[in-house]
Amino acid sequence: MVHGSVTFRDVAIDFSQEEWECLQPDQRTLYRDVMLENYSHLISLGSSISKPDVITLLEQEKEPWMVVRKETSRRYPDLELKYGPEKVSPENDTSEVNLPKQVIKQISTTLGIEAFYFRNDSEYRQFEGLQGYQEGNINQKMISYEKLPTHTPHASLICNTHKPYECKECGKYFSRSANLIQHQSIHTGEKPFECKECGKAFRLHIQFTRHQKFHTGEKPFECNECGKAFSLLTLLNRHKNIHTGEKLFECKECGKSFNRSSNLVQHQSIHSGVKPYECKECGKGFNRGAHLIQHQKIHSNEKPFVCKECGMAFRYHYQLIEHCQIHTGEKPFECKECGKAFTLLTKLVRHQKIHTGEKPFECRECGKAFSLLNQLNRHKNIHTGEKPFECKECGKSFNRSSNLVQHQSIHAGIKPYECKECGKGFNRGAHLIQHQKIHSNEKPFVCRECEMAFRYHCQLIEHSRIHTGDKPFECQDCGKAFNRGSSLVQHQSIHTGEKPYECKECGKAFRLYLQLSQHQKTHTGEKPFECKECGKFFRRGSNLNQHRSIHTGKKPFECKECGKAFRLHMHLIRHQKLHTGEKPFECKECGKAFRLHMQLIRHQKLHTGEKPFECKECGKVFSLPTQLNRHKNIHTGEKAS
């Protein structure tokens, strides 16, 4: 057997706390990946070494500078265990030990020749031959990193010392050619490690190994607290923080704490506004390279992760996992405040901010604060009007790619999520979950002013603005203000006249998809929502809720001018226009003005003569559905109350 002299210390790199702080987040990630992979190579090739402290810390995603070195007379206990103490002596300046050539080959493949320090040119040529698997009896002798002089490649890793390997693309310097080669694959796009299951390729072997566990389903790391299993030790360690609540790293800007320093570094870029990673397709900037890679999949439309239940495809594995929980109903993350459960930890974290009221992200334009950064980014589009994602079917633009994807399913007609209660289909799992609350009648969010309850927190926020009078969304065309951004968007289509949603039955067009859906029920006669008090059916859940207040007699909305009370807020708004005399909707044909938009629409049919609603009994046509319903009473003999 051909042997060479390599120890774990030969391929290990140590950092002080000061040196570690000099590294960028992607450099720290690369360091973790390479160190863990090299250690796994040594173990897989038969090296019986005890686990070094630095490996334990890296597996726990802690900082490697936290290693406490203990000076002992036995400097290499792991190598003595494998090869005997007589071959590894503290008095031996070379700190030599013979290792199989396969070990040296594996290490050199990962780290490059610069990982080792040779005492003369002859030894370098011998090592070069060993790298190429040349046959022969080569006794390689290499000096441990702990014996290296300060001019060696190991010393050059410290952030303020020499880094001889420069990337010609971006000018970044590296201490070893192997690190430069790995870095260059970012620019070249080279991904030599390909998954045979789904064809996905990776730059690093350790990334490939992690990915394969998604297909095999292997989850060897189990949480002792709750029994949940994970494919990677790092995932288990992150999960443990849920139980311990430990967050050591605090942001000095806003006081937010994190359980990992890398998360703190990422968070700090939000305050600094630094976004060094730019998409060449659309110019969008990101503060992390990983976010850029995720974003680029939007342009390539790559979706390698497919659901075995319904065939739906996703860009990212976590999206597939989240989607699968819709089929299984699994919700492992529960809120201790209200007992609500969630499919993802991120959703639980978002939900918990409802109870704490924390809103650290503030809009510089209008001062509005948000609990999540992505909510702030969405809000900013109201001020900028930016909508980079356009539908090729109808030309409609969106400010988020996810909104475009949702919209495209309208044209495709795909509705893979079906309600088991009533059979209604949805194009998104989130919409199905929202719909199911109609059947369960769950309403956990209660208004403190009037005790009105809501299914969703966003509904409570919108409702609260009725009491406060807050209307932050203003139309730039007519100055009208709204308490919801979606209401402003709906209103703006009045000025543009855009009606992209057309009924295939009668050709009638609508501004909103919701209006088209409601209209289509006129043709089908579908009324899935039944009142348990009187048995009356309704096309929409909101109509049923309005109807229920007839039985309860509750009228929470009172006019401050005259004291008249109403069951619905929209009825109060209509009534208030009697006092103000406001009539913003004017007919272009004759100049007549109306208080309500629906009054204008009715009036315009006098000019057009349009009568799309026909009685199936006698063939008589009407301009409004209410007129048709009144007419039907003639045939049925029913007297309207």
From Swiss-Prot:
Cellular location(s): Nucleus
Record keywords: DNA-binding, Metal-binding, Nucleus, Repeat, Transcription, Transcription regulation, Zinc, Zinc-finger
SUPFAM superfamilies assigned: beta-beta-alpha zinc fingers, KRAB domain (Kruppel-associated box)
Domain KRAB: 6-77
Domain of life: Eukaryota
Any one Gene Ontology cellular component term annotated for this protein: nucleus
MF term (GO), any: DNA-binding transcription factor activity, RNA polymerase II-specific
Gene3D superfamilies: 6.10.140.140, Classic Zinc Finger (3.30.160.60)
Pfam families xrefs: KRAB, zf-C2H2
One Gene Ontology biological process: regulation of transcription by RNA polymerase II
Zinc fingers (C2H2-type) by residue: 165-187, 193-215, 221-243, 249-271, 277-299, 305-327, 333-355, 361-383, 389-411, 417-439, 445-467, 473-495, 501-523, 529-551, 557-579, 585-607, 613-635
Keyword match Zinc: yes
Repeat found in the keyword field: yes
Family to which this protein belongs: Belongs to the krueppel C2H2-type zinc-finger protein family.
Protein's job: May be involved in transcriptional regulation.
PANTHER family hit by this protein: C2H2-TYPE DOMAIN-CONTAINING PROTEIN, ZNF44 PROTEIN
The protein's name: Zinc finger protein 780A
Organism name: Homo sapiens (Human)
Gene: ZNF780A
